Amino acid sequence: MNFYRSSIISQIIKYNRRLAKSIICEDDSQIITLTAFVNQCLWCHKRVSVSAILLTTDNKILVCNRRDSFLYSEIIRTRNMFRKKRLFLNYSNYLNKQERSILSSFFSLDPATADNDRIDAIYPGGIPKRGENVPECLSREIKEEVNIDNSFVFIDTRFFIHGIIEDTIINKFFEVIFFVGRISLTSDQIIDTFKSNHEIKDLIFLDPNSGNGLQYEIAKYALDTAKLKCYGHRGCYYESLKKLTEDD
């Protein structure tokens, strides 16, 4: 059970009706608590990511493979040298091969680890910049990470999903707001226009009807929730992200 005290969940509960029962999904490095709400009042928060679970026209779920693992990003970010070394020595299995090589040289250490190549997957999105609203944040992040213009993206804003992510490796909590959407492109068309960048190494596409892992469980919860009646919502059913950006 997740005992993290969210900074915004009390406000979300106060102004938005809960739409579905919360679920908890987990793997060997993360515990994620998801709760769906009818979108009655939502605002951007500077410490909460906004992400989109997007379906292609050939019914695939778009997922991004991060260039850097979560652990590597944390090791680089932290200034505490003791913590850097401890994370590296204790959890090097959660790094990819290149990261292990770089850090082994940096610390002059060679941890006993399997020769695995870690890949951390995420949904497109990120932290809103100063002054950005939800549509603007999603438009920018999807363009930067996946190279898709907002004119191809349609978002269901009738509801949203609040997620609390506990990273059990680095012992930190993160919050995220998920929206469900569609892309008026096939998975092949998206791959053709995608350009590997400093955040995203490549793309993968999941089958919404079968699979395993955290990203599949998140998508299944979101897509099942999308079938429910969102009485009292103040959003739109698959509105163009471009139009949402212009309207706001």
Curated annotation (Swiss-Prot):
Q: Does the keyword Hydrolase apply?
A: yes
Q: Where in the cell is it found?
A: Host mitochondrion
Stated consequence of mutating K129A: 90% loss of decapping activity
Alphabetical list of InterPro entries matching this protein: NUDIX_hydrolase-like_dom_sf (IPR015797), NUDIX_hydrolase_CS (IPR020084), NUDIX_hydrolase_dom (IPR000086), Vaccinia_D10_decapping (IPR003301), Vaccinia_D10_N (IPR013683)
Q: Where is the active site?
A: E141
Q: Which cofactor does it need?
A: Mg(2+); Mn(2+)
Residue ranges annotated for the Nudix hydrolase domain, each copy included: 45-227
Transmembrane segments in this chain: where?
none
EC assignment: 3.1.3.-
Q: For the motif Nudix box, what are the positions?
A: 126-147
Q: Which residues bind Mg(2+)?
A: E132, D167
State its role: Decapping enzyme that remove the protective 5'-cap from both host and viral mRNAs to commit transcripts for decay by the cellular exonuclease XRN1. Preferentially targets spliced mRNAs and since all viral genes are intronless, it preferentially targets host over viral transcripts. Acceleration of the turnover of cellular transcripts promotes the shutoff of host protein synthesis and therefore diminish the magnitude of antiviral response.
The protein's name in its UniProt record: mRNA-decapping protein OPG122
Q: Which gene holds the coding sequence for this protein?
A: OPG122
